[in-house]
Amino acid sequence: MRYELIIYWSRADEAFVVEVPELPGCMADGSSYEEAVANAQVVIHEWMETARELGRPIPEPRGKLAYA
């Protein structure tokens, strides 16, 4: 599944931050853009695995692609 990723630089954290708005609380960071996106893929997998274990629904991706 392909979820929307919001990626931005955080001056406070001095890192790139990735938010996955379709998966509540799903965030990752990294010292580079590429590392942040790779970390987000791991966190998305873990988020979905935890949701399955708890019997919670996993939202379908909205399918919107946008550049900001």
Segments the model singles out, each with a brief description of its role:
Residues 8-23:
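Short aromatic-glycine-(Arg/Gly/Cys) micro-motifs in beta-strand/loop hairpins
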Residues 24-35:
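A short, exposed loop/beta-hairpin motif centered on an aromatic-Gly-Thr core
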Residues 1-6, 13, 38-68:
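Short, charged, surface-exposed hinge/linker loops at domain edges
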Residues 22-25, 60:
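Hydrophobic residues in alpha-helical membrane-spanning segments
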